[in-house]
Amino acid sequence: MSNYGWLKTFLMFVMAFAMQSSVGDWLKILDVGPDFVVIFIVSVALRHGAATGCFWGFLAGFTLDVYAPVEWLGANAIAMTIVGFAVGQLEEHFLTLNLPPKVGVLGLAFFVNDMFYFLITGLEKDVVTTLFITRTVPECIYTVVIGGILFYLISGKKSNV
């Protein structure tokens, strides 16, 4: 990745966190909103591969751990690093994905991220089940819808160039 590519990715990183903090609050429905940070990690990993996805996943997760009041410092960093690596591996070694599979990968990545976070923080089984039903599934659906729209806009812009 060139210096311009790193700068562009860093600006996308900052924009994802800004959108998570501002637009994400406006888009909440019944206290459920999209996760722009996961959308960022998946898009970077799909475009640039596992190493870059791992790097930005760790940076985004660590930033979330520091930014949000969390008792388990590092839980987001580990979970998002795993997501960035896994999504990057899928893209590099198997196939180049068009829009519907990318959206499916985004949904799977969201579930993997939440499950690893719950596993790392050591939440009890009944708490995880409740969170899964009340938070993870609705947020995943919302994130997939917003991510699908963003992937469509990005792919449309890319094909016109």
Where do the PLM segments sit?
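Terminal, non-globular segments
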Residues: 1-161
